[in-house]
Amino acid sequence: MLFNLIHNIHKEGYIFIMISFLASCIGFAISCSLGIVCLAMSLLCIFFFRDPIRVVPEGDNLITSPADGLILDIKEVNSPIDSSTQVVCISIFLNILNVHVNRIPVSGTIKSTEYIPGRFISASLDKSSELNERQRLIIESNLDKHLIILDQIAGLIARRIVCNAYQGQNVNLGEKFGIIRFGSRVNIYLPLSTHISVFKGQTVIAGETILAYLKEAPKQLTVKSI
């Protein structure tokens, strides 16, 4: 049971959990009430850094959600890498209670990664997409070589973006690649030709919720747990 608990916590959370448990021990040595407060913080850290197994659909045609959260907006915008090209932007807001592990939205190859410095205003605001610190991935899909752009965006509280993907890496749908600590936003930019299957206000689950299809939806899906 302990192994399963540790296995289902993202490694980025280990140091926070160890420090909070140490603080709990010291807190109980000082007073019971202080120890209880510190222990509650430890449990919150475990909850925040949880990394549950997901049932991921299979297929090069699929684009799944890169993050847990709420879809704030779906709209046509200029591509962030080519202002002459129109794309569909799906914005996902992660509150502090969501799972914050990010997953690859489409099977393909990482064409580039880019760190973009910026501010730390609330990630629920539209202007955070342009002003806040973010990490950008550009993925070339296996199917028809479409470019899918993904921005991990820091928020008011989230000030640490972790991205383990690298240029030239072959990635699979639903594969874990990073995490954003303590509330954030993820924007995904898709070709206009994609068939969107979600709506504004919908709650999505990383690796499981299908955001769109590169071509028409298949009649049957297969899944795997990762």
UniProtKB/Swiss-Prot annotation:
Transmembrane domains' residue ranges: none
Main location, first listed in the record: membrane
Site, as annotated: Cleavage (non-hydrolytic): 183-184
Reaction catalyzed: a 1,2-diacyl-sn-glycero-3-phospho-L-serine + H(+) = a 1,2-diacyl-sn-glycero-3-phosphoethanolamine + CO2
Listed InterPro entries: PS_Dcarbxylase, PSD-A
A GO term, aspect molecular function: phosphatidylserine decarboxylase activity
Swiss-Prot/TrEMBL keywords: Cell membrane, Decarboxylase, Lipid biosynthesis, Lipid metabolism, Lyase, Membrane, Phospholipid biosynthesis, Phospholipid metabolism, Pyruvate, Zymogen
Modified residues (Pyruvic acid (Ser)): 184
Active-site annotation: 184 (schiff-base intermediate with substrate)
Entry's cofactor comment: Binds 1 pyruvoyl group covalently per subunit.
Pathway: Phospholipid metabolism; phosphatidylethanolamine biosynthesis; phosphatidylethanolamine from CDP-diacylglycerol: step 2/2
Enzyme Commission number: 4.1.1.65
NCBIfam families assigned to the protein according to its UniProt record, in alphabetical order: PRK05305.1-2 (NF003678), PRK05305.2-4 (NF003684), PRK05305.2-5 (NF003685)
Job description of the protein: Catalyzes the formation of phosphatidylethanolamine (PtdEtn) from phosphatidylserine (PtdSer).
Family label: Belongs to the phosphatidylserine decarboxylase family. PSD-A subfamily.
Protein name (Swiss-Prot/TrEMBL): Phosphatidylserine decarboxylase proenzyme
Gene name per UniProt: psd
